[in-house]
Design a protein with these regions (language model features):
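Short hydrophobic/aromatic beta-strand immediately N-terminal to the Walker A/P-loop
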Residues: 54-58, 86, 196
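SF2 helicase/translocase NTPase motor core
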Residues: 2-7, 11-47, 63-190, 221-229
Length: 229
């Protein structure tokens, strides 16, 4: 008689055995993480198949986006493609992200906040630490945003990425209103080698709003308003 864990392990084994594209997998061997088939396919079958990982990961709440983000981080680090990582999340889930990444992947992320700034004095904590977690709303402050811009990151992950919103206004579709979060995205995401945006609500019925979000991933492809969905 098999339980759920046995079935998941068997599916994982068969996928890894039958697909050569999964042959270099590192994160799935972690005893603390038993990824589901859709998580394996997303990370190994899609994201890691391109030299620059720049993806919008849209999935239902509870589908394990944090797990997929952790798997991606472990793989990129194991392949020496990412050393410095920044994760921006809503403030209420900062500790949850930190604890889950520590427990499941052995990754210790430093939470940077106003107390951290005081502790570091004249030093920039975003430069001094390689693995950083910060509140996305705190990051847009005028005294914080420049500190993030000074630090170069190999991989930037944004949870609730749809909050980095921009809107085309007017009938001529030439005036664009950019929220402060979107302006932060423009400032830091385009210079990062790898970007992963996480959201459960990527498209809210506004095609232009969605196009602006995708521009943060690939400005060349999504610059023109004639790009169709």
């Amino acid at each position: 008689k098999f339980d759920t864990v046995d079935i998941q392990k068997y599916i994982q084994y068969k996928m890894l055995q039958s697909e050569i594209k999964f042959s270099n997998a590192r994160a799935v061997g972690n005893k603390n993480v038993i990824p589901l088939p859709h998580q394996i396919e997303a990370v190994y079958g899609r994201m890691l198949q391109v030299p620059r990982v720049r993806f919008l990961l849209a999935d239902d709440p509870g589908a394990g986006k944090t797990i997929m983000a952790g798997m991606l981080m472990k793989e990129l680090m194991a392949r020496y493609q990412s050393e410095r990582i920044l994760i921006l999340v809503p403030p209420l889930v900062l500790r949850q992200w930190q604890e889950e990444l520590e427990e499941k992947f052995g990754l210790h992320f430093h939470i940077i906040n106003r107390n951290t700034l005081r502790e570091y004095g004249r030093k920039n904590p975003f430069i001094e630490n390689d693995l950083v977690l910060a509140s996305m709303y705190w990051a847009i402050r005028d005294d914080v945003k420049p500190l993030i811009q000074e630090a170069d990151y190999d991989l930037i992950i944004v949870d609730e990425a749809h909050k980095m919103a921009a809107y085309t206004q007017g009938t001529n579709k030439k005036k664009v209103f950019r929220t402060k979060l979107y302006q932060l995205g423009e400032a830091i995401l385009r210079k990062a080698e790898h970007v992963l945006l996480l959201t459960a609500t990527p498209h809210k019925g506004d095609t232009e709003n969605f196009r602006h979000l995708m521009k943060l991933i690939d400005e060349d492809v999504f610059t023109s308003s004639v790009v169709n969905e």
